[in-house]
Amino acid sequence: MNSFFITFEGIDGAGKSTHINFVEKYLQDNHIPFISTREPGGTPLGEKLRNHLLNEDMDPYTETLLMFSSRMQHINEIIKPNLDKGVSVLSDRFTDATYAYQHGGKGVNEAFIHELKTLVHSKINPNITFLFDCPIEISLERLQTTRKLDKFEKEEKSFHQKVRDAYLKLAKAEPDRFVIIDSSQTIETIQIQIEQSLDKLIS
């Protein structure tokens, strides 16, 4: 059985979590084995780094290097072994998030990130990436009703706009991989779009 690497991206407050659960149920219903993971995190080491990355102020380049350190461990310990044995992998964020947040939001040189990506996972890339997109005003409003915010979620509106713009630029550059979902739509409408994309992926 083929395994699939499916990633979920979007600005904070775009509403990924509900739809990740929907994809999990879709794969279960279609008898496709999978695991769900997240970035930063996904491994014991990655989860320790996650706490530092989301809550401590640091130089943007240090942040980027730590993201890729966590990612390399994640790939070698979780992602690659599962894909190799036919188990699909769902990841809440992957390298696109580093381009969006560290390059788009914080100005880290894009070539620096690209070089790290080439070193860490030149041969492992998502089969499909769902990008949940909505106006910044909606995402920020949603964030006010959730849990305690991390350092990225607390950033100014201009930061979130730059992250959103970077995500849309990535999606435009790779239209065959990205599925842009307007997450301001109803849950039912969004899930119909997701299901159609997954049907095409596994057919």
Question: Predicted segments — roles?
Answer:
Residues 13:
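Walker A (P-loop) phosphate-binding loop of P-loop NTPases
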Residues 19:
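Hydrophobic positions on the alpha1 helix immediately C-terminal to the Walker A/P-loop
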Residues 2-5:
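Pre-Walker A (Motif I) flank of P-loop NTPase domains
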Residues 8:
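Hydrophobic anchor at the beta1->P-loop junction of P-loop NTPases
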Residues 24, 137-203:
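NTP-dependent small-molecule kinase module
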Residues 30-121:
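ATP-dependent small-molecule kinase phosphotransfer cores
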Residues 98-165:
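A glycine- and Lys/Arg-enriched "phosphate-lid" helix/loop adjacent to the NTP-binding pocket
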Residues 16:
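Conserved lysine of the Walker
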